[in-house]
């Protein structure tokens, strides 16, 4: 959301000017350039339809030149977020989504405490583009 982006910019201070910030519906995003690093903190797990997931993969496959960093709800995470259905992933299932173009480098899970004092388990994975 725009509010989340603003909070992230505030945390980064002057360094925020070094980041390309984009607020968009990912399924309608039309990149006009390539990206060396793509960091998705919590978008991919909201894509539950095959068409949406495939569109996301088309975008990153076409416009990410080096590294892909993705945070999703793990298989031990919630089934819904903010009332919305989500997709859960483990390292293998997330890797299978991106392995034609990207190679999994690392994955780990981490508990995140929400502002409502609940715990959500996330999977964070880093990928590098295959030559």
Stretch-by-stretch model annotation:
Residues 39:
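A conserved beta-strand element that flanks and buttresses the S-adenosyl-L-methionine
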Residues 1-33, 50-131:
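Class I (Rossmann-like) S-adenosyl-L-methionine-dependent methyltransferase catalytic domain
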Residues 42-46:
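Short catalytic micro-motifs in class I SAM-dependent methyltransferases
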